[in-house]
Amino acid sequence: MTMEYRTLELNIISAKDIKNVNLFSKMDVYAAVSLSGDPLHPQGATTHVHKDAGSNPTWNYPVKFSVNESLAKENRLSLEIKLISDRTLGDTVIGTVHVPLRELLDNPGDDSSFRQVSYQVMKQSRKSKGSLNFSYKFGEHVPAPAAKTPKAAKAGQEPVMAYPPAGAGSSSMPYGTPHPPPPQQYAATGYGYPPQQVHGGYPPQAAYGYPPQTGYGYPQQSGYGYPQQSGYGYPPQAQKPKKNKFGMGLGAGLLGGALGGMLIGDMVSDAAEYDAGYDAGFDDAGGFDF
């Protein structure tokens, strides 16, 4: 079923007592007329600029639209007229007039003549200031105008907009996967040579200074023994290396003295046993008769 369209002829006549948005000069005013509610056939027009019009501009500017009659009867179409001050540093909206198209359709007037009406101009503050005068007339039915396709171009751009998020997601995956291996490599080296614990205590100096046999012998046992306990138990003691060296030297001296005493005692006891055995043998020999 085809939609029925009718022509709507307008004559934007004039405005009266509208707000003056200029401070030092008279306003140069024009009107922007648009028909809203029909997304397939957006329509609009702009009058000429009335120079030095002030608050009472006059245009007598003709405008012609094609109106979807079914949408107008459903009260889905409206006529919007904006009064604008033309300024060098940027135009300023003085006020706006909204007219439901059904209201005009229900009061067509004579078919052969225009009907003149007046509507209040609403400022941006929702207060009325001044009035707008225009006339209108509905014509005969006409074929539907060609549908404009601005949205088709936007639809074609939607896939382009979808690519950046996908690329961002794919690029984030490679950066996330390579990060776990480095901690595993450092952990593997940590099991072979505990660098953090070695720097806390001083066992690595013995391991690096002496041959591998001594390094894997006593120095490692002392490194995994006392240095770990001092590192985890009393971290502040690592800042006092001189006291630790003195304690180790004193312990080594005591241990060396004890070992020396034990060795000397063993030598004395061995000499005593040897002397006793010699005497016993001599006594036995003395029992022989020559």
From Swiss-Prot:
GO terms for cellular component: endoplasmic reticulum membrane; plasma membrane; protein storage vacuole membrane. Residues 1-245 are cytoplasmic. Residues 167-187 are annotated as: Disordered. The keyword Endoplasmic reticulum applies. Keywords: Cell membrane, Endoplasmic reticulum, Membrane, Signal-anchor, Stress response, Transmembrane, Transmembrane helix, Vacuole. GO terms for biological process: defense response. It is found in: Endoplasmic reticulum membrane; Protein storage vacuole membrane; Cell membrane. Induction: By cold stress. Residues 269-290 are lumenal. Residues 1-114 form the C2 domain. InterPro entries: C2_dom, C2_domain_sf, C2_SRC2/BAP. It is a single-pass type II membrane protein. The chain crosses the membrane at residues 246-268. Its main location: endoplasmic reticulum. It holds the Pfam family C2. May play a role in cold responses. This is Protein SRC2. It comes from Glycine max (Soybean).
